[in-house]
């Protein structure tokens, strides 16, 4: 018998991430002009006010109807997977919560303003990474956690087959 995990923790994670994402974007949008930047960690991290009406790296710029439809489908799918497949896997619940929060955070921006507020500007190993936000970070961490969970699950299944 597997332990069924408390979904309240996952809901709290999602709510916290969405609130943190929206508050940080609000602060940037109301205190900085687009293009304004200040250095936080020399040669590594800047806060730069930027807007993006596309997806990562600006792809599909201006395709708002597409983003609305896809995001709604993704949010519904994440709730479905959370309810049906993640009840007994806390790691997967956290991953899905982070994906949900990230998708919702950027969706809120698109609905309210038609663009996403980005502000985290990094230079990693000499690569000037595209400017992103908390929602994007949440999506990235969620994807990484799902990959880890799937690899772990595959590894556990192989171990059981050997025994």
From Swiss-Prot:
Chain ranges passing through the membrane: 11-31, 64-84, 88-108, 131-151
Main localization (coarse): membrane
Domain of life: Bacteria
Enzyme Commission no: 3.4.23.36
Localization per Swiss-Prot or TrEMBL: Cell membrane
GO biological process: proteolysis
Catalytic activity from the UniProt record: Release of signal peptides from bacterial membrane prolipoproteins. Hydrolyzes -Xaa-Yaa-Zaa-|-(S,diacylglyceryl)Cys-, in which Xaa is hydrophobic (preferably Leu), and Yaa (Ala or Ser) and Zaa (Gly or Ala) have small, neutral side chains
Keywords: Aspartyl protease, Cell membrane, Hydrolase, Membrane, Protease, Transmembrane, Transmembrane helix
Topological relation to the membrane, as annotated: Multi-pass membrane protein
Catalytic residues identified in the record: 118, 136
Record-level Gene Ontology MF annotations: aspartic-type endopeptidase activity
Pfam families in UniProt: Peptidase_A8
GO cellular component, one term: plasma membrane
Pathway note: Protein modification; lipoprotein biosynthesis (signal peptide cleavage)
NCBIfam families given in the database record: lspA
Recorded family membership: Belongs to the peptidase A8 family.
Function: This protein specifically catalyzes the removal of signal peptides from prolipoproteins.
Protein name: Lipoprotein signal peptidase
Organism: Staphylococcus aureus (strain bovine RF122 / ET3-1)
Lineage: Bacteria, Bacillati, Bacillota, Bacilli, Bacillales
